[in-house]
Curated annotation (Swiss-Prot):
Keywords: Cytoplasm, GTP-binding, Initiation factor, Nucleotide-binding, Protein biosynthesis
Protein name: Translation initiation factor IF-2
Function: One of the essential components for the initiation of protein synthesis. Protects formylmethionyl-tRNA from spontaneous hydrolysis and promotes its binding to the 30S ribosomal subunits. Also involved in the hydrolysis of GTP during the formation of the 70S ribosomal complex.
Region (G2): 458-462
């Protein structure tokens, strides 16, 4: 008998045939579908693997390779036939098996699987001719050797699996404890809710009158028995140990299965088939879920949870909010109508329906329904007046308090002065008079400066405010322009002043702007001091000036009046001290006082947009003290005072009464002449500013719509009158100059042409101005300003014309000449003569020709003619031919006969009269 070391060798016996030993490989044939009805026979092999434990492999590795002839006593134990599998107990009762026991369990499971698949394989009789085979030899379970690194990796993986298993068990225990605590808390809250519900039922039962029902006793829900935590993992059992008859089968589940899963649908366990139905009694449990933001707000707010909630995120509801929520829930359960709350509704002059409903705490739909019942179809966004709003509010049962939008301005100029804090203040003196009478030169002589040299053309085009000191007393001077275009500036200066100095040139006497200044001073009820200037000239005549002032009710002291007059010379600085003494004397008579401790208010003298400093307003503080950091409202602009600059260019910490300063920090450029006041907060300042801006927009829209009228009126007006406009964009250095230019250009307008100011403002010419001028086909006028680089490039690209001026005379003259070009020329008609038609002839090539005799004047060829029949003009045109006999002539004098033909007209008869005239077009000017 031949014995081989390999399992696959042939063994030969004396009387036996050659056979192959079982190799653990099962073969079979299946039919594979190849498509389109074709099949193919495929051989399928099923191999059976018997894994071994790492301990057996390590024990057998030093002695040589598995399968050698060396003894293998430390190798894996032979696989025994397992006992019949018992029916497993419920899965919940079986402790979870740790991972170290898995190899042995897998061997058992594999053997069981083999036994089920091949039940007759183990009972197959063995050949009796193999007495020399060792039953303890392993049958090739390990197919290859493992290196030391692979063994270390396996050991590390096994250790990590054990650690993970312990951590998972600990985490599951902690989660179970937390779930138990949550369940207890839920049961407690359910009990409280049941008690509250019972109390509500009791209250409802007491309120019921018809059939009172007995109040059910509150039954607390039975507390569920908390489920015990998972037991600790058992120690690994020996690899070859068999399970006891009554013991549960070991579990091979690696992870925790979801709770509530039906055991009937789980299928057989890995240890063996499930014989019966597995029932695990477990109480129903509400799965925990994270709270949403709305649910976090549902808890009651107590002292301990006032800051944060249980998660440390959002604060819970207050007790009042919780009480309101419970009351709302109770009303919804009882279906009680909500109690009507009567409110006091504040109604402005106009209000939208949506805002009115919000102030009444009513639904806008209800208000719309009420209006529909009254026959008014409106939407929530429609604006209604105060009368209709009051009617609606009264109908809904509310009281009404009507206010005006102008109430936001109440109190800002009504601050009362403290009589105990009143102190003397410097007088405010305005220098007024005709242009070129030396007002600015006089002020320069007083201030010992040279402002007039910096003025273009030697005339003042701004209001300048300065403060000088004389004998320890301060005097505030305001210099106003004398040109006719600056009427508003002079009026503004007269309103802000205490004393007016009327400057009259001794060599020029009283002029129109002098008279206007007198009227402004009298309208403002301001005392006048006459300063007769230029007495150093030879042609000076002060007496003539005094006599002319009498005609305008200005009585000087030398003429028996009360008006002080001083003869001065600004050039030679003569009698300037006398003029200042007269000012101080007049101020002493007026007894000027102010309260510096109150909030400041005053007047905006001038405003401009500076490139480096932004909006700069020259203001005159009339009351109180202005300091940096205060919030002021000037016209429709507001801002926080960033800095105060005096007339010398220095920064000051405060500006007292009668002190002129420049204010930096406004949000925009206010209009000259606006009043300013200090307010307590930015919100109040913003509210006042928005109201004034809205009011200005409404006024501008009303003015524009009133001028425009309907579309039909516009078209008919253009067709009838041929009205033309000269669009302009005006930019100046200060707001006062803009006003003067606009006023001067408005005076140039006539019924046929006028200047249309597309935009005007203070500041440099920008690219947006170029775009606006291009869109409106307007010219740009810059007064003491220039265009920046971007604006110049845009003007060259678009072809927009920019004109720069620094003297208002030149500006007005150029605009006047340009507007004159828009005027249609005047049509002037000159009568030439009359001719009477004696006979009408038909000429083949010419048509009808009238044989006429000139009875008055003369008739010229090419002149205009009218055909008059029965004193009615029936045709007007030109002569086509004029012949005397057969010759073309230029004209025919009176008493001679001629032949005439008309252009494109032949309805002529004998006895008609032909009137000849000449038309001339004459260019007009404004």
């Amino acid at each position: 008998m031949t014995d081989s070391k390999d399992d696959k060798t042939l063994s030969v016996t004396g009387k036996k045939t050659l056979t192959l030993k079982p190799t653990g490989v099962n073969q079979g044939t299946v039919r594979q579908d190849m498509g389109r009805g074709r099949t193919k026979a495929v051989v399928v092999e099923t191999r059976k693997r018997r894994p071994t434990r790492p301990e057996d492999e390590r024990a057998g590795q030093p002695q040589g390779r598995v399968g050698d002839d060396a003894p293998a006593t430390a190798a894996a134990a032979p696989v025994q036939t397992p006992a019949p599998v018992q029916a497993p107990a419920p899965v919940a009762a079986a402790p979870q098996a740790p991972r170290p026991a898995a190899p042995a369990q897998r061997v058992q499971q594999t053997n069981q699987y083999s036994q089920q698949r091949h039940p007759g394989q183990q009972n197959r009789p063995q050949a009796s001719s193999q007495p020399s085979r060792q039953p303890d030899r392993p049958r090739g379970a390990v197919l290859h050797d493992l290196s030391a690194s692979e063994m270390d990796a396996r050991r590390r993986a096994l250790a990590e699996a054990q650690v993970r298993e312990v951590e998972d068990a600990k985490r599951r225990a902690e989660e179970e404890v937390r779930r138990q605590a949550e369940e207890v808390e839920r049961q407690r809250l359910a009990a409280l809710e049941a008690i509250r519900q019972a109390e509500e039922d009791k209250a409802r039962a007491l309120e019921a009158k018809n059939a009172p029902e007995p109040v059910a006793e509150p039954v607390a829900p039975v507390a569920e028995t908390p489920r015990a935590a998972d037991p600790a993992p058992r120690a690994p059992s020996p690899a070859g140990a068999k399970p006891a008859a009554g013991a549960p089968a070991p579990s091979f589940v690696r992870g925790r299965k979801p709770e509530g899963e039906d055991d009937e649908n789980r299928g057989p366990a890995r240890g063996g088939p499930v014989r019966g139905k597995v029932v695990r009694p477990e109480p129903a449990k509400v799965p925990a879920r994270p709270k949403t933001e709305d649910e976090r707000r549902r808890g009651k707010l107590t002292v301990t949870t006032a800051a944060v909630d249980e998660d440390g995120n959002a604060r819970g509801r207050s007790l009042s909010a919780m009480r309101r929520r419970q009351e709302k829930f109770r009303r919804s359960q009882m279906q009680e109508p909500r109690e009507k709350v009567m409110r006091e509704v504040v109604l402005p002059e106009t209000i939208t329906i949506q805002e009115l409903s919000q102030r009444m705490s009513e639904r806008a739909v209800d208000v719309i329904k009420y209006l529909m019942k009254e026959g008014q179809m409106m939407k929530p966004g429609d604006v209604i007046d105060a009368d209709l709003a009051e009617l609606i509010a009264t109908e809904f049962g509310h009281t009404v308090k009507r206010v005006s939008e102008s109430d936001v301005e109440e109190g800002i100029f009504d601050v009362k002065d403290d009589a105990g804090e009143m102190v003397s203040r410097p007088p405010v003196v305005t220098i007024m008079g005709h242009v070129d009478h030396g007002k600015t030169s006089l002020l320069d002589a007083i201030r010992q400066t040279s402002v007039v040299s910096g003025e273009a053309g030697g005339i003042t085009q701004h209001i300048g405010a300065y403060q000088v000191e004389q004998n320890g007393h301060k005097i505030t001077f305001i210099d106003t322009p004398g040109h006719a275009a600056f009427t508003a500036m002079r009026a503004r200066g007269a309103q802000a002043t205490d004393i007016a100095i009327l400057v009259v040139a001794a060599d020029d006497s009283v002029m129109p702007q002098t008279i206007e200044s007198i009227h402004h001073a009298k309208a403002a009820n301001v005392p006048i001091i006459v300063a007769i200037n230029k007495i150093d000239k030879h042609e000076a005549n002060p007496e003539k000036v005094r006599q002319q002032l009498l005609q305008h009710e200005v009585f000087v002291e030398s003429m028996g009046g009360e008006v002080l007059d001083v003869e001065v010379s600004a050039k030679n600085k003569l009698n300037l001290d006398k003029l200042l003494e007269a000012v101080l004397l007049q101020a002493e008579i007026l007894d000027l006082k102010a309260d510096p401790s109150r909030t400041a208010e005053g007047l905006v003298i001038e405003a401009q947009l500076d490139r480096g400093r932004g909006s700069v307003a020259t203001v005159l503080v009339q009351k109180g003290t202005l300091r940096p950091g205060q919030i002021i409202v000037a016209g429709d602009q507001w801002g926080r005072v960033r800095a105060l600059v005096n007339d010398k260019g220095g920064h000051v910490k405060e500006a007292g009464p009668a002190m002129p300063v420049e204010v930096l920090g406004l949000s925009g450029t206010p209009a000259a002449g606006d009043k300013f006041a200090v307010v307590e907060s930015e919100a109040r300042a913003r509210e006042i500013s928005e109201y004034r801006q809205r009011l200005a927009r409404d006024k501008a829209a009303a003015r524009q719509s009133g001028q425009r009228g309907s579309l039909e009126q516009m078209m008919s007006k253009l067709q009838d009158t041929g009205f033309k406009e000269f669009p302009l964009v005006i930019k100046a250095d200060v707001q006062g100059s803009v006003e003067a230019i606009v006023a001067a250009l408005d005076k140039l307008g006539t019924d046929e042409v006028r200047a249309r100011i597309v935009h005007s403002g203070a500041g440099a010419i920008t690219e947006s101005d170029i775009s606006l001028a291009e869109a409106s086909n307007a010219a740009i006028i810059g007064f003491n300003v220039r265009a920046n680089v971007q604006a110049r490039a845009a003007s060259e690209r678009t072809g927009t014309e920019i004109r720069y001026y620094n003297i208002i005379y030149d500006l007005v003259d150029d605009v006047k000449a340009a507007m004159s070009g828009l005027l249609s020329p005047e049509r002037r008609e000159t009568f030439l003569g009359n001719a009477e038609i004696l006979e009408v002839f038909n000429i083949t090539k010419t048509g009808k020709v009238a044989g006429c005799r000139v009875v008055e004047g003369k008739v010229e060829r090419g002149a205009g003619v009218r055909l008059v029949r029965d004193n009615v003009v029936i045709h007007e045109g030109k002569l086509k031919t004029l012949k005397r006999f057969k010759d073309e002539v230029a004209d025919v004098p009176m008493g001679q006969e001629c032949g005439m033909a008309f252009e494109n007209y032949e309805d002529i008869r004998a006895g008609d009269t032909i009137e000849c005239f000449r038309v001339e077009h004459i260019t007009r000017t404004l």
